[in-house]
Amino acid sequence: MKDYNINIFYSEEDEGYIADIPDLKFCSAFGSTPEEALKELQIAKAAWIEAAHAEGIPVPPPR
């Protein structure tokens, strides 16, 4: 099963790592390490999908 592409990058401004899923608009998370940002992103992804279902918003498939 295919999963969403994830970007992780260091933000000088935030002094930490940001992880995001481009296919899920505004789905991102912050962490002090790349691993922490990824862990937080998994939580954010689940919440994003749950909220989309609750609002009747289609969830785009992974590309």
Language-model-derived ranges and their functions:
Residues 22, 28, 57:
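Flexible, active-site-adjacent loop/turn segments at secondary-structure boundaries
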Residues 1-15, 20:
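N-terminal segment of the canonical double-stranded RNA-binding domain
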Residues 14, 29, 54:
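Short glycine/serine/threonine-biased micro-segments
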Residues 25-36:
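A short, exposed loop/beta-hairpin motif centered on an aromatic-Gly-Thr core
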Residues 1-5, 35, 39-63:
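Short, charged, surface-exposed hinge/linker loops at domain edges
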